[in-house]
């Protein structure tokens, strides 16, 4: 069975744990994991048009729908017309900020309605446009596969240092395609269905730690592949692939346990969580601030870590509860329309 449901949410935890100092090794695989898992479960037989229509329905309808909900909430909270226009432009441009953060200090931040995590949905769609163009040929022609991977890497490196972050993460589409192709190749080889190979897992773990140390500062959302600019791209690909392998292995390890089943349930609500977890974290923080002094970085470690762990837990559970209510309402509406 595919380990995707058990692993996608594991990958989403580090972004919220960033302030707790856990992100150096955890966050590097966060976004690549989603691409790898998507490629892993790829099914042949659909036309290019069918694949893209499916992706548009799965990704773009939630993106614009949930973005509109968040925009409306912030308008009701008192956003000015100018702020609302800027937020609407950010939704259309779909990027965390406008410029490369290593080049421009006074950046233009575009996701201003707690929708920062939703850049992935349009990034994934952009990568899918490339992936579905080449994947079937890649599976049938090894020379074409190798050539495609080389060209995709070269394009990614060429776009790595341009000053502007392109809309819909077009500049990440090629590297996203590399991760998706890797996932598809793993799926065709039934890589995760094989018996546990402890020496291989240990080797992958060592490679992941070493490359993470050699090339720190990875943040795919703002096109930061590490500290070496364009030359960080190969390191980033290795980090993303090895980190994804480790995460999926972990998902396989726990998939038949109670925590594994819970994570599988969470995985089914990944898009809803991506859309609303930042807003939920803000709500929890506002409520908590009325009752306690919020622990700050540099203070006592235990209260700081405990607070953020509880804050993340409350936000996730709140999102899951709301998602469950919406799903039940949808089911009732479907029954009535039959």
Task: Report the location of each language-model feature.
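Alpha-helical transmembrane segments and their immediate juxtamembrane cytosolic regions
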Residues: 1-338
